[in-house]
UniProtKB/Swiss-Prot annotation:
The keyword rRNA processing does not apply. It comes from Shewanella baltica (strain OS155 / ATCC BAA-1091). GO terms for cellular component: cytoplasm. Its main location: cytoplasm. It catalyses: glycyl-tRNA(Ala) + H2O = tRNA(Ala) + glycine + H(+); a D-aminoacyl-tRNA + H2O = a tRNA + a D-alpha-amino acid + H(+). GO terms for molecular function: D-tyrosyl-tRNA(Tyr) deacylase activity; Gly-tRNA(Ala) deacylase activity; Ser(Gly)-tRNA(Ala) hydrolase activity; tRNA binding. This is D-aminoacyl-tRNA deacylase.
Length: 145
């Protein structure tokens, strides 16, 4: 399971000209599911995302996590994160989870974060989305479990 996380001052996702999710300070999480992913991996990754220290403390060091800064999550499914780009000029998605598996783990990821008290907005699974963000820093990390 892969999460490309970006520290944002604001982010939103639009489907069919309608804003369906938006946050201010927090993290934009692009979430990719791979074939071998499980609920256990999802919980480990969600915990890591929420606990990852990527916000600056009073000394300017990345020492604070999402909860410590009162931030929110915007979680957007992105199967292209599971692409194999090692050969040729066209990505292979053979390692990506099936749509049913990916939807289930995506929904469980969101529910897990919400159950931990984190304000969590979402995109729309499988939709053509326009994602806008102001990357604060920029600060971006690729987390994988």
């Amino acid at each position: 399971m892969i999460a490309l996380i970006q520290r944002v001052s604001r982010a939103s996702v639009v489907v069919d000209n309608q804003t369906i999710g938006a946050i201010d300070k927090g993290l934009l999480v692009l979430l990719g599911v791979e074939q071998e992913d499980t609920r256990e991996k999802m919980e480990k990754l969600a915990t890591k995302v929420m606990s990852y220290r990527m916000f600056s403390d009073e000394n300017g060091k990345m020492n604070l996590n999402l909860e410590q800064v009162g931030g929110s999550l915007l979680v957007v499914s992105q199967f292209t994160l599971a692409a194999d780009t090692g050969r040729g000029l066209r990505p292979s998605f053979s390692g990506a989870g099936t749509p049913d598996q990916a939807l289930a783990l995506y929904e469980e990821f969101v529910a897990f974060c919400r159950a931990k008290g984190v304000t969590t907005e979402t995109g729309q699974f499988g939709a053509d989305m326009q994602v806008s963000l102001v990357n604060d820093g920029p600060v971006t990390f690729n987390l994988q479990v």
